[in-house]
A protein has these predicted regions:
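Single conserved hydrophobic/aromatic residue that forms the stacking wall/gate
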Residues: 1-10
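Short runs within selected transmembrane alpha-helices of multi-pass transporters and secretion channels
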Residues: 68-71, 140-160, 166-178, 182, ...
Length: 227
């Protein structure tokens, strides 16, 4: 009888773990498929555009390290507070760490922009590739501090509270309808260069920011429970 009771407890725990892990895995898998779709379209732009885009992605990843770290830490902090039933404290940390992430993002973007051109020279890029890469870096430096933080950092807190299905649906829809579809349309039908990928990405970030802000303020995500 005791073994059966422990088995039921373990089953409930495993089902709760899977209820978080499976949507997160699906979200990440769809994201990788989306990246492949974009890269296949980028390959039609020529080697100079591909080289410019490759370095722009590296620089964009570099300026997002600090904020991404804040988001990951938020998942841990928020998970502990919501798990202990301290909902208001969890909301406080979501807001506070989102602001910290925004400040870190602004500083990181400015620093990356300052060292961007020297890195391009060190990479030995051709003039045309350097021009395209610099244009993309300027666009990223302007758009990312405005759009990224609200679209990603609060989502970590919502996932920690158990609102994983909503996050998965939003992420997949914005990924495919904004980032992928818009980029492919601009490149294949409007003749845009690699900047089209970033226009699609900015649209993705902006719509995510609006949706997750509305979701957070509505309080519906607090109706979800992990334990």
């Amino acid at each position: 009888e005791r073994a059966r009771g422990l088995g039921d407890v373990y089953k409930r725990q495993i089902s709760k773990i899977l209820s978080i892990g499976i949507p997160a895995g699906v979200e990440n898998g769809m994201f990788q498929f989306g990246k492949l779709a974009i890269q296949s379209t980028e390959s039609t732009l020529g080697t100079q555009a591909i080289a410019a885009q490759a370095l722009a992605i590296v620089l964009e990843n570099l300026n997002g390290i600090a904020s991404m770290g804040v988001g990951i830490s938020l998942m841990t902090v928020a998970g502990q507070t919501f798990g202990a039933g301290r909902t208001e404290e969890g909301k406080y940390y979501i807001v506070k760490l989102t602001w910290y992430g925004e400040i870190g993002l602004i500083l990181s973007c400015l620093l990356t922009f300052a060292v961007g051109r020297p890195i391009m020279y060190l990479a030995g890029m051709e003039p045309e590739s350097m021009r395209m890469c610099y244009e993309m870096l300027v666009a990223i430096t302007i758009a990312k501090p405005l759009l990224w933080a609200l679209g990603f950092i609060p989502a970590y807190g919502l996932r920690a509270a158990g609102d994983v299905k909503f996050s998965m649906i939003v992420s997949i829809c914005t990924m495919w309808f904004c980032r992928v579809a818009l980029a492919i349309y601009l490149i294949r039908f409007q003749g845009f260069g690699p900047i089209a990928v970033w226009i699609g990405m900015f649209a993705d970030w902006g719509i995510r920011s609006i949706i997750f802000s509305i979701r957070f303020m509505s309080g519906k995500w607090m109706e979800k429970h992990v334990i």
